[in-house]
C-alpha cells in the first residue's frame, strides 16, 4: 500500500530544481552550435535533419519543433529542408549583457515517439559598439602643492561588447605633466587613473586641457573620447577622506521606494569652505542614477525605484566626497540585491495533442516547461494535477514535463477534460500558478446501436390501404458523429415461405414500417420478422430486434349458409308428420362465417313464414322446430325464410329458404342401435347421449328423404308438387374455409339413401365428409371417445 502511494505521488507531484541539468537527462550530449550576432533573419545555423540522423520527411512526420525558454522564438525549423534558421536578428548585448559566453539553450521536440534533443547556441560577439564615457567633459581642480606621482581618479567609459571587443585601455594626449593608467575592477571593467608626473604651477599655466581616449580590442578597434579640463588651485592642504573605502550592503528586492539603504561619511581636516564636504555619484551609469539617489549633505543613499533581483542582482556605486577647495575623496558602495519570492512560477506550453481517440493507450497529451525567475528555494517548483483524473505528469529533460493519459478513455462517459496544472514554488510565502488545458476525447465506434425494445408488437387491421404506416422501431447509438448515425433494414426472415419483401418495408433513416399491400386476416393472421440497426462507423456495428405484426379481423365476410343449399337448384323439402308434437325438430340451418371472434358469432331468426306462429327458429343453433300442434287445417306446404346474422359492426347477414311439407300418417321414427351396440354398452353415458342426439337429427333428415323417394316411386298424384330432394355433392366454396380454427363450424355433408321394398333392411349411413378440413366439433368428441362407433342406424 505504501509503495502504491509513493508511485502515485511520483505521478502526481514532481519537484523541479532549477539547475542546469546538462545533456545527461536527454540521454545524449548537448549539441553545440555558434553564430555571430547581428546575422539577418533566415541565416542558416545548421541542418538538423543531418545532425539528428533523420530524413527530412521523417523530421516532418515526427512533428519536429524548436522549443525555447520563454515565449520568444529565436529560431525556426524548415520542414522542407531540415535547416535550423534564425527567426530574428540576435543582439548579444541585449540577450546576455556582459555575460560571456552568451549561450542560448533550446530543445528539439520530436513526437511519435516523444524525444527531446538538448542544444546550445553560442552567440559570438562582434565589435559593434564603441566605448562611451558617461561624461563627455571632466573638470578637475588640482592643488599646486600636489606632489608628482599623485593618482587622480577619472571617469570611466563603457563598452557593451565583451572579450577582446570590450574596452582594453585608456590614453591621453601627450603632455609633460600627466600620464594615464588603465586599472581593472573586480568585475573586470577597466577604469582610468590620471598620474601627475610634474608639479603644477598656476602662475605658469593655470588651466590645462587634455583628451582622454578609451580603446577597445576589436579589429579594427573602436574608440571613445572625453575632454579633461584641469584647473590648478592654490593650496588646500587636506582632501576629504571616507570612513570606509568600501561599503557593502544587502537590500531586499521588495524594499520600499525612498528607503535609505546606506549612509556614507567622509571628513576633512581643513576648516572653512575647505572643510565643507558634499557627496555625489562619481561617474555613475544611467541605471544607477535611475535606481539610487544620494543626499549631497548627509550622504544618505536612497532607493528611487524597486529593485529586481531577476534583472540585476548587484550594483557597484562610486561616490565622491568633495570639499570647498575642490579636493575630493572616493569610496565605493556594493549593493547586493537579496532575492524575495516575488515571481510566481511560469508555464510555457509547447504542444497539445487534442483531441485523442478514446481507445488510445498511454498517450502524451501535452508538452510544457516551467520556470521561476527567483533563486534558491524561491525558484524550486512543484507541479501537480487533480487526483481524480486519468492523467499523470512525467518529467522530461531539464524543466520540461509531459502530460500523459493513464490508459484508454471512454468518450461516452466523458468527452472533455479540463485539466488544471498547478505549479507552486517553495518560497515563503509560496506562490502558485494555475494553467488550464482542455483535452477533447474523439469518438471511436465501440458501441452498437441499441433498440428501445427487444421486441415490438404492431397491430394492423385487415383490408388496410397499401403504404400504410403501421408502426416504428427506434435504436440509439451512444457514439457520436457518423458512428452514431443509424440505418435500419429488414433482415431475411427465418421462415423461407414468408414473402416479407412484399408485405412490409422500412424507412432506412427513421425506422418507420409500412405495409406494402392490403392484409387479409383470413389468409394471414400474424407474422414476425427481424429488423437490423447498423451504424456508419468503421467497422460498422449492428443489432437487431424482433417485430411481431398481428392482423386484426374486420367484419368483411357475410355468413354463408351450408344447409340447406342456396344454389338455385331444386329446393329440398323437409317432411313433417302432422302428428308431430310442439318442439318437433324440423331441420337445422347450418351456416359459417369466415371472420373470427364476435364477427363470427351467428344468430338466427325467422324472417318470413307462410303461416306465422307454426314454426320457430332457435337463435343460437339454427334449429327449426314446430311451435304448436299441427292440425288438418294447416296448409300442407310451407315456405320459411331464416335470417342468419353475425355480431360484427356493422353486422352482415344472409338468408336461407326452407320448404316444409306436412304429411299424414308419418310417425316419429324409432332408430334402434345395431346388433353391435351391446359391445358399447359399457361406454360412458355422456358419450352415448351425444351419439344418440346426433343420430336423431340425422335420422329425421334421412327419414324425410326416404319418404320422398317412396312417394316418387309410387307415382302418386302429389309427386309432382313434392319433387325430388337431392343434395349436390362436392365441396363448398374454398373461401369459407376457417383457417384460424376459431370461426364458426364449417362442415359439408353427403348422404346416401337406400330404400327398396325387398332389401329386408333399412340403413341410414353417414358417409365421409367431402371436405376433410370441416370436422364438426361434436363429432370429434364422439370419435375421440369411441373411434370404433359405427355410424349406422336401422328403422324398425
From Swiss-Prot:
Gene Ontology CC entries for this record: membrane; plasma membrane; synapse
A Pfam family reported for this protein in Swiss-Prot or TrEMBL: Cadherin
One GO biological process term: calcium-dependent cell-cell adhesion via plasma membrane cell adhesion molecules
The keyword Aminoacyl-tRNA synthetase is assigned to this record: no
Domain Cadherin per the UniProt entry, residue ranges: 35-133, 138-242, 247-347, 352-451, 456-561, 568-671
Protein localization: Cell membrane
Glycosylation sites noted in the Swiss-Prot or TrEMBL record: 169, 418, 436, 567
PROSITE patterns: CADHERIN_1, CADHERIN_2
Residues passing through the membrane, by range: 691-711
Residues exposed to the Extracellular side: 27-690
Chief place of localization: membrane
Domain of life: Eukaryota
Cytoplasmic topology ranges: 712-796
Signal peptide segment: 1-26
Keyword entries, A-Z: Calcium, Cell adhesion, Cell membrane, Glycoprotein, Membrane, Repeat, Signal, Transmembrane, Transmembrane helix
Membrane topology: Single-pass type I membrane protein
SMART domains: CA (SM00112)
Keyword NADP in record: no
InterPro entries: Cadherin-like_dom, Cadherin-like_sf, Cadherin_C, Cadherin_CS, Cadherin_N, Protocadherin/Cadherin-CA
Function: Potential calcium-dependent cell-adhesion protein. May be involved in the establishment and maintenance of specific neuronal connections in the brain.
The protein's name: Protocadherin beta-3
Species per Swiss-Prot/TrEMBL record: Homo sapiens (Human)
